[in-house]
Amino acid sequence: MKLKPNDIYIPLNSIQFKIHHNDINIKYDTEEDNNNNNNNNNNNRYIDDNEKMKISEDESIFKSINNDNKNQQNDNIINSFNRGSNSFLFNIINFYKSPRFLSGGAVLLYVMTTYDFSASNFLLFNQMVVTIVILHILKHFNILKINTNFEKETIKKLMPLSFCYIINVLLGLDSLKQLNIPMYSALKRLVAVVILVMEYFILKKVSPPKIIASVVVMVIGAVVAGITDLSFNSLGYSLVLLSCIFQASYLIYVKKVASNMSTYDMLYYNSVLSLPITIFLMIVNQEIEYFQTFEHLYDSSFQAYFILSIFLGFFLNFCIFFCTSVNSPLTTSVTGQVKNIASTIIGAMVFNDIIIHPINILGLIINIIGSIWYSFLKLTSK
């Protein structure tokens, strides 16, 4: 290639293109400069990449910390829930495993035995108050018709009912603390005998011979089982027998006044008239002060069972009043013993507070046969 006077030629290995020496404004890059620029760019990219990686790592760490915090918070919430639910489920399992579940007033007795809560009158007082409040609410919304006007004749008629109810409940709870479940169930079937006698003298009612025979079979079974009970407890037997008398009186009174009063009226009056008795017993036993200083007062499980026992008390009383009004005191008594058949069998097999004896088992079987026979006779007579 021929060079002109004003041209400068630089070898291609040191320059990328040809320029005119007067064109000073033209920027050119040598291979060295390009290498430097490339190195700088690479360095810049490396720095940018490092910064991005660092930022990305920081963000990841920050997100990880946040996630860890959130996970820890969630774990704390879940663990707290699990601890609470497991505690409640554990109590539920223990409750259903408890022999007291198999008897009447299970929740009430569970509260008293598991938490060593001895203020039974205070608990019954709350049951009465809740019953009154519920009935007033139902009346206010015209769901039920309840006569809340007290008259002297009504008070005189129902006062024995309320007295027998309170005494029966208290004696039943105390006797359950002294006896095992099969023996308690067997002896409570003697209520049917007391009712047969009271129906004859008070209601002027004579039961058919087969009904009487089935009741006699139940009594024989109870006596046989009681004689061979190696864990004999004289106090427990005395309390449960007294409880039978007051329970029979209570059911007889319900039937006697049922013709002139609805089930809801009887339930309302019984609750109101029971209040003075329970208040008096609470004051005498200093149960209000006891409740205020009770060690499990703020235990959520105790609170749940306490409230549950109150509302179940209302439901149980309504069922007893209704069944007795529609049927008879004897039927209510025997029907209430049907679940005691399962109580007797399961209690004898599962729980270790029973001393097994062959004759004792025979007595329980005879007792159960009498209960089934009575139920069959009542069903076929309808």
Curated annotation (Swiss-Prot):
GO BP terms in the entry: transmembrane transport
Keywords: Membrane, Sugar transport, Transmembrane, Transmembrane helix, Transport
Record flagged with keyword Membrane: yes
Domain of life per record: Eukaryota
Segments crossing the lipid bilayer: 117-137, 183-203, 211-231, 234-254, 264-284, 302-322, 354-374
GO cellular component entries: Golgi apparatus; membrane
Main localization of the protein described in the UniProt heading: membrane
Sample GO molecular function, one term: antiporter activity
Membrane disposition: Multi-pass membrane protein
Pfam families: TPT
Entry-linked PANTHER family: SOLUTE CARRIER FAMILY 35 (PTHR11132)
Family of this protein: Belongs to the TPT transporter family. SLC35D subfamily.
Protein name in UniProt: Putative UDP-sugar transporter DDB_G0278631
UniProt organism field: Dictyostelium discoideum
